[in-house]
Amino acid sequence: MDIKPREAPPSHVTTAEVVAWVGERLRSRGERMTRSRTAVITALGDHGGHLTADDIYRAVSAADPSIHLSSVYRALDALAHLGVVQHVHLGHGAASYHLSAV
């Protein structure tokens, strides 16, 4: 169920285009594009680079305070499982996440 590299969107696209692209891929696999998943992808797309779950949560909650930290973690887990997001451990600190589709 991973999104294959050949399916990646072209580089230099807007965050909205990435959200739409990921949504299409998820729906084609029978997955839902939830509000939490959309918010996580938007945060990663807008802020770029490697963000911790707490960084992502701060960005998400600034845009939509009704999304809880546990929802962000669930969205990150689901998106990582689907190959949309990758997480890395840099040293002994918290894991960081980035979009693998871009």
Predicted regions and their residues:
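Short, Lys/Arg-enriched N-terminal segment that forms or immediately precedes the first helix
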Residues: E17-R29
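Pre-recognition alpha-helix immediately N-terminal to the DNA-recognition helix
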Residues: T38-A43
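Short capping segments at the starts of secondary-structure elements
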Residues: D46-T52
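Non-DNA-binding regulatory cores of transcription-related proteins
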Residues: H81-V102
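Basic amphipathic alpha-helical segments that dock to polyanions
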Residues: V72-L82
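C-terminal regulatory/oligomerization modules of transcriptional regulators
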Residues: M1-V18
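A short acidic, leucine-rich amphipathic alpha-helix
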Residues: D55-S61, V72
